Amino acid sequence: MNEYGGRMIDRMKPLGLAALLALLAVGGVRVIYPTASQDIALQPLVLDVDNPALRRVGGLVFEGAWELRSRNEDFGGISALVALADGRFIGVGDAGTLIGFGLTQDERTDRPFIAPLPDSHGPNQNYKDRDSEGIAHDPMSGQFWISFEANHAIRRYSSGFARTTGILRLKQMQEWPDNKGAECIIRLRDGRFIIIAETLDGDTHPALLFSGDPVERGSAVSAFRYRPPAGYRVTDGAQLPDGRLVILNRRISFPKGFAAKIALVDTATVKSGNIAAGKVIASLAPPYLVDNMEGIAITQKTGATYIWLISDNNFSIFQRTILMQFQFPPDPKTKKPEALAAPGFDVL
């Protein structure tokens, strides 16, 4: 098998690979490379190998995809993603690892790094202290918040992850099942926070809405529920520039393997006692490129909005860390009309 097993995976039949991934999704075969390399390599991918020119996926436009690779033993398992103002991304791994990178125009990584999450690898700490699943960021203060699904906690970190500045272990969160806790954390631009649990009660996820920083005692908390598309579970979420939420939902099934759906949620429906449900705008399933999609982030450039997805490879040789970029076109109904020429200037 060649480097990283990439070509071996490309040669496998899509259906057979999907079935294998479904079986190995929970406990993959971890690949250990004995190196602390900070390098992250990119390999461009297409959305559909049988139709490389395909770009339209539901309401989104495919812009590009890349497989991320590194020989660092801690690289992988990315379960959430956030975009920074300087153009880079930070992903958080479910083994307590921070993975940062940007993309250059020649499809190389910009200032990559792989580092342990502070205060998660001490002698008195175990996997539950490292099972980080969600990440949120305040671009003004530089602070980060990370959710942990096993010990049902939210930790706040100072700018640059220099130190831990607070921790929340809310009673309502402690009632969530082990390893099915805070899967998704979203910071809204008005300062409120949303936390959605991985566990499903019937067809909805329990969720919490905080009036402010969840770590601060003055923040009021209210409960609501999120209904994912049938057969799917929430993995991550972010807020669009227009204020709506974009929620990433994933399905693992045999023999079909992985699938993902992106849903839009009206933020006004996120309120105490309510069930918030989204409208699916795009679906990914074989033969389209898809893996264990767990992270989502939003960027803007020259007025265009982009949705980024990233997959959790479960440290398995049978899966990949895939980064995908889609443009989210503006709704024609809300697009501002073009200005008309003034009288006498329409011929210019």
Could you tell me what each predicted segment is?
Residues N2-A339, D346-L348:
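Sequence/structural signature of beta-propeller domains
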